[in-house]
């Protein structure tokens, strides 16, 4: 059943009207000649607003990783930061940089870790720890609603040193 809409007369034509809040919280009027048409316009507009809000709230993996590296620069030595930066850019941003933080799943991360698993065990382990740290920080900052790395383990990846 359609909601009850108000009516407005404009230039001798009867229109149905509703108001919705846009992404900035400002009321926007939507007009249509029939209640069905107005309902369709309203649902489409609300969908677009929801989509815009979602994209505004969740940055891309690349954007958030750069921000995370900047935040880490306060806590770690310069050599550690250089190591983090190299691994984040090579193994995280290169694989998932264009995806939004809220859209990343455990499967995406595990697929991104496949090339890393061919590297040494220590590189694999540190990249997994970086993934976990970055997504934990995003969760704590309320950038994402759930942490996809919660079940990710450092076990089983990488080539042991004596086998190389």
Language-model features, listed with the residues they occupy:
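Basic/aromatic DNA-contact patch characteristic of tyrosine site-specific recombinases
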Residues: 1-59, 63-71, 83-86, 111, ...
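Short clusters of hydrophobic/aromatic residues that line enzyme substrate/ligand-binding pockets
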Residues: 2-8, 101, 149-152
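N-terminal core-binding DNA-recognition domain of tyrosine site-specific recombinases/integrases
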Residues: 27-31, 35, 57, 69-143, ...
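Short linear capping/connector segments at secondary-structure termini
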Residues: 107, 151-157
